[in-house]
Amino acid sequence: MAEWKIYTPEGVQDILQNECFFKKNLEDRIRKVFRASGYYEVETPIVEFYDVFSTEENIIPQETMFKFFDQQGRILVLRPDLTIPIARVAATKLKDAAYPLRISYIGNAFKYNELGGGKQKEFTQAGVEIIGVNTPEADAEVIATAIDAVKATGLENFQIDIGQVEFFKGLMEETGLSEEETEKMRVLIDRKDFLGIEELVEEHNIRDDLKELILDFPKLFGSTDVIDRVEKYPINERSIKALNNLRSIINILDDYGLSKYVSVDLGMVQSLNYYSGTIFRGFTYGVGFPILSGGRYDRLVEKFGKSSPATGFSMGINMVMMALDRQKVEFEKPRVDTLVCYREEGRKTAFQICETLRKQGLAVEVDINGGDFETARNYAALKGIGGILKVLDDENIEIHNLEKGEVSKVTISELLKA
């Protein structure tokens, strides 16, 4: 159908000059944060085997993936996530590297009905992974790096909510709920469905103090006082260990000087089959979805043949861009500093001037409209170029300051000295 050739499919889009400049600038800022903290960037293929993302835990539902076949009939996918391919690389090509591994990435992923961002099917993720260490220091470093990355984007009003999935799992052990009922409880708590939680609790013979704690679960968020409050209950060793781990991480973040960005949310219980300890999400106003998420996933790398603990986070670049736009955060826009025009006899000189100015860090365009100055002037005004250098001959130049409406003449040597 020929009429579709001028459109893009639903969920993908062209990114035009200003927005693309903005996006690449954002990625560069984030990349500098990662590199400054010792993370080395890797790239994994956009196309992967379906088996890489197919797990018994159904971490990424198969119906959300873009699937197709290769020439041998094997199922391929456009990667729906970047963390899982990093785990594959760590367990195979980097299995003999010095541990802990600090890996970073920035790349596009593809998924049907991606949460947030207008249901985009193509989106950009940036993140880091620490592989090979299971310590509170590693988890705290990942969270600190996430905070530094958000700050580098220009966002100032944001919050990182931190939870611990082992705390929930420990409580569920005490209740005697089946796996199916535990999953049902997880969903109810994640949705903060108080009525549903109460109904499920009343269906079982759960001791009163534990029942009280479970009913309070969706409200267990805020400052570190939440941990103090929960520790007063007679909880089991697994839950106590989880709370101690969480407190250690928060204390380390306090030493980083990042406490003001951090809050506790013990009701954060999504993806129990994926996360194995710390879990966190980042929020800012103007966007109804997390701008980043992460946590500890000690069982993922093992899927690819090497048992190794891991922790990391992923930031949604598109979500951050949306937040910056809605919060009216000013960002640098692409611009050309100077347009150089010339007559034929001054062409070589004009090119030499361009080269010199570019080495000085200026963005310089050469007029290619055929030498008509008025055409060049109108083009520069329309594009927002501040000035025009008109090369008259091998020695003399006219400087047209379009912002002030001023014209002056200088020699080439005078210009280059300035």
Swiss-Prot record:
Keyword Nuclease assigned to the entry: answer is no
Keyword field: Amino-acid biosynthesis, Cytoplasm, Histidine biosynthesis
At the top level, the lineage of the source is: Bacteria
The answer on whether this UniProt entry bears the keyword Repressor reads no
The Gene Ontology biological process terms listed for this entry are: histidyl-tRNA aminoacylation; L-histidine biosynthetic process
Functional pathway:
Amino-acid biosynthesis; L-histidine biosynthesis; L-histidine from 5-phospho-alpha-D-ribose 1-diphosphate: step 1/9
Q: Name one GO cellular component term.
A: cytoplasm
Record InterPro entries = aa-tRNA-synth_II (IPR006195), aa-tRNA-synth_II/BPL/LPL (IPR045864), Anticodon-bd_dom_sf (IPR036621), HisRS-like_core (IPR041715), HisRS/HisZ (IPR004516), HisZ (IPR004517)
The subcellular localization recorded is: Cytoplasm
Pfam families assigned? tRNA-synt_His
Instruction: Show the GO MF annotations.
Output: catalytic activity, acting on a protein; histidine-tRNA ligase activity; transferase activity
Q: Which family does it belong to?
A: Belongs to the class-II aminoacyl-tRNA synthetase family. HisZ subfamily.
The record's function comment reads: Required for the first step of histidine biosynthesis. May allow the feedback regulation of ATP phosphoribosyltransferase activity by histidine.
Task: Describe, as the record does, how this protein assembles with itself and its partners.
Answer: Heteromultimer composed of HisG and HisZ subunits.
Additional facts recorded? This function is generally fulfilled by the C-terminal part of HisG, which is missing in some bacteria such as this one.
Q: What protein does this entry describe?
A: ATP phosphoribosyltransferase regulatory subunit
Its source organism is Acetivibrio thermocellus (strain ATCC 27405 / DSM 1237 / JCM 9322 / NBRC 103400 / NCIMB 10682 / NRRL B-4536 / VPI 7372)
